[in-house]
């Protein structure tokens, strides 16, 4: 092998080139590569965190939905109980009103019955007096008296 000055010069130039690249070119390239690796790692970590946050949000939403459904069920049950209570109160009130109206109607019927009896008594008394007057006027005849009494009984 022949070592001449050209090979030696090329070797020195290559070594200087490598040294220059290692000193001035390689560090910015490595910094850019490391920066990019860090950005990618941060992006992946951020995506993982976002995925976990999404899972937590889904779980939280599911829990809140279950709680909301339970609350809705409780509210519906309370509304049904209140509806039943209102219906019972309305039935009770209607029953009381019916009882009151029936009692009032019976009282009115009884009052009308008493008034009718009193009116009937007055008419009977008037008829009895009229019959007595006729009997007194015709008291001479026994057959006429029994005829007047029969007519009076028929009128009553």
Curated annotation (Swiss-Prot):
Keywords: ATP synthesis, Cell inner membrane, Cell membrane, CF(0), Hydrogen ion transport, Ion transport, Membrane, Transmembrane, Transmembrane helix, Transport. GO terms for molecular function: proton-transporting ATP synthase activity, rotational mechanism; proton-transporting ATPase activity, rotational mechanism. SUPFAM superfamilies: F1F0 ATP synthase subunit B, membrane domain. It holds the Pfam family ATP-synt_B. The chain crosses the membrane at residues 11-31. It is found in: Cell inner membrane. One of its GO terms (cellular component) is proton-transporting ATP synthase complex. Gene3D superfamilies: F1F0 ATP synthase subunit B, membrane domain. F-type ATPases have 2 components, F(1) - the catalytic core - and F(0) - the membrane proton channel. F(1) has five subunits: alpha(3), beta(3), gamma(1), delta(1), epsilon(1). F(0) has three main subunits: a(1), b(2) and c(10-14). The alpha and beta chains form an alternating ring which encloses part of the gamma chain. F(1) is attached to F(0) by a central stalk formed by the gamma and epsilon chains, while a peripheral stalk is formed by the delta and b chains. F(1)F(0) ATP synthase produces ATP from ADP in the presence of a proton or sodium gradient. F-type ATPases consist of two structural domains, F(1) containing the extramembraneous catalytic core and F(0) containing the membrane proton channel, linked together by a central stalk and a peripheral stalk. During catalysis, ATP synthesis in the catalytic domain of F(1) is coupled via a rotary mechanism of the central stalk subunits to proton translocation. Component of the F(0) channel, it forms part of the peripheral stalk, linking F(1) to F(0). Belongs to the ATPase B chain family. HAMAP family: ATP_synth_b_bprime. This is ATP synthase subunit b. It comes from Salmonella gallinarum (strain 287/91 / NCTC 13346).
